UniProtKB/Swiss-Prot annotation:
Keywords per UniProt: ANK repeat, Repeat
Keyword DNA repair: no
Presence of keyword Repeat: yes
Pfam family membership, one: Ank
UniProt xrefs under InterPro entries: Ankyrin_rpt, Ankyrin_rpt-contain_sf
Protein name, UniProt field: Putative ankyrin repeat protein L63
Origin species: Acanthamoeba polyphaga mimivirus (APMV)
UniProt ANK repeat ranges: 81-110, 111-140, 141-170, 172-200, 202-230, 314-339, 340-369, 370-399, 400-429, 431-459, 461-489, 490-519, 521-549, 551-579
Amino acid sequence: MDDTYNKLPDEIWLEIINFSNEKNLLFTNKSFFELFDFMKVEEDIIECIIKYNLLHILAYIISLGGPESFIIKKNIITTESLNRHFKMSCEKGQYTIVTYLVALGADFRIDNDYGLIHAAKNGHIGVVKYLVSKGVNIGANDNCAIKFASENGHLEVVEYLVSKGADINANNNYPIEMASKNGHLKVVEYLVSLGVDIRANDDYVVGLAYYYDHHEVVDYLVSQGAVLNKSKYSSSYNAFILLPVEIWIKIVNHTQEIGLLLTNRSFFELLSLINIKVDIIEYISNNNLTDVLKYLVFLKSINHPFCRFIRYSSLDDYLVKSCCEGDLSIIKDLILLGASERKAVMLACQNGHLEIIRYFVSQGFNIKCGSNCAVTIASENGHIEVVRYLISLGADINSGNNYAIKYASENGHLEVVKYLVDQGANIRANNDRAVRFASRKGHLEVVKYLVSKGANIRAKDDRAVTLASQNGHLEVVKYLVSQGTDIKAGDDYAVRWASRNGHLEVVKYLISQGANIKADDDYAVRWASLNGHLEVVKFLVNQNADIRAINNYAVRWAHKNKHFDVVEYLISQGAVINPT
């Protein structure tokens, strides 16, 4: 940029850029970078930086303080943008960009370690190593990382993941099965060297290799002891080329191995001539035949009679799987085939897949449908970026008697709880259910926050402390007591149910605070005995509980439930098992 432009005052630069809408002009000189603080930025800054390969700008933002810099704190660069581009960069193996985005605050564990799984899937060893060094879970999503790396033949990634503890037998030998299916001999050899059982599932590994014409893999597996049953696995090449149509129809009708036809579109029409007993959508899903799925979409678009074989219940099952994995391409195809669009959005909210939600919103989906279920589900599962996005579109967080904050509190999602409160959620709704259910689940920080915002811990006869006691959450109990809760409420419900459920430390604490263990005819010792909690029983006896209350109820029910150690102890203390 020449001196003429450099000498322009800031206000002229702002006018030029706001008029031209060319925000990337600011990236051309670090001295102009601060102008972002004075502008209304609508573009995705990270997208612009990556598009023009301005990695030095990312480095500069990091030097400004990374997550603490004004450009992050003022939401000029959003968390959603950082996370979205982090995932895409992991998929593409853009190592430097990945490290910079993490330094700026991207969540490297977002969506159940999406970054690691897709870096491994695409063979990006540098990104994989970096993410592992940051502490991702290599076993996330049922060891998807090693499964996908094996499936796609990325030996170096497979070796590295194994060195870090990945399960080579994940999902019933999925890694070697998919490596064999796709002809990745080196990966197969490596997995065999580690002791994978190549004969598992009735020699399925060698059968797959044979079926897909990977003869080198077949020869190797046979040399290692695998047994190939050629009558069970027909070679796709020879069978399709040599057999006449009428024989193929007979074979498939007899074996119900519809995969023999699904591997080649030129034979797909034969399916309409076959008496299919196998669920075709389930088969496509289980075997990851996405190209066949797309062909089904085409057949449906022309009203092909074969579409009568599609079972809608199976479409929804496949939809659940795809939404969990965040695979938008498959989801689109399933919707076109008749799967529920609403279910797809709710599953995306449940699993935190913001891109999927954005897509359906762009297609006109009403995020307020079903009493604002979308924002409730996202809140329940702690997906803060999804919650923010839905609220920005007008989702009603108070719908359904404030279910959003109740479920977020119950599941311990403090960040979501705070955001919902900032947006006007009513923490007192439904008799202070939020604090009651946070107490029940033991989420101390959520309880403290709700109390700081005015939640009533004594609602519903001090239900918060009784639920915390019932479930053994000692620290929550202590905190609630410090805030003035009545541990004797409900005829000493707290100590009775803590005893009933075997929470010894809670029982001890409650008694130290004045709880009455003899309440309700010595309920505490009776039910501790009935449920076999010996240490609780001993402690209560030492505190003078009456073990003979209600006609020796304690020992009789301990005996009935076969808690013989409790029976022996109670008898030693004077209980009578068969009172006259």
